Swiss-Prot record:
SS bonds (residue pairs): none
Signal sequence residues: none
InterPro entries membership: Chaperonin_GroES, Chaperonin_GroES_sf, Chaprnonin_Cpn10_CS, GroES-like_sf
Protein known as: Co-chaperonin GroES
Pfam families: Cpn10 (PF00166)
Family as reported in the entry's similarity comment: Belongs to the GroES chaperonin family.
Subcellular location field: Cytoplasm
Length: 94
């Protein structure tokens, strides 16, 4: 079984946040800032606008930066994912 997003939605898996600051302080649990970098694991077919399907700009495997509070968090087969709209993705990291 897999997650297949609809329309212009994208499924991402957050990359782990740094656990140590640049100055060497170890950050725990609630003090960690929510990461905004993720890997794309599934991509919808694109939104339909004026009867035409739009092309998606991201693809599976892309590393992306996304809006801090965007999307809906879901748990699927023991893993945590976020489903968001392509518009909530700010950039592709190369």
């Amino acid at each position: 079984m897999s997650i297949k997003p609809l329309g212009d939605r994208v499924v991402i898996k957050r990359l782990e946040a740094e656990e140590t600051t640049k100055s060497g302080i170890i950050v725990t649990g609630t003090a960690k800032e929510r990461p905004q970098e993720a890997e794309v694991v599934a991509v919808g077919p694109g939104a339909i606008i004026d009867g035409k399907r739009t092309e998606m700009e991201v693809k599976i495997g892309d590393k992306v930066l996304y809006s801090k509070y965007a999307g809906t968090e879901v748990k699927f087969e023991g893993e945590e994912y976020t489903i968001l709209r392509q518009d909530d993705i700010l950039a592709i990291v190369e």
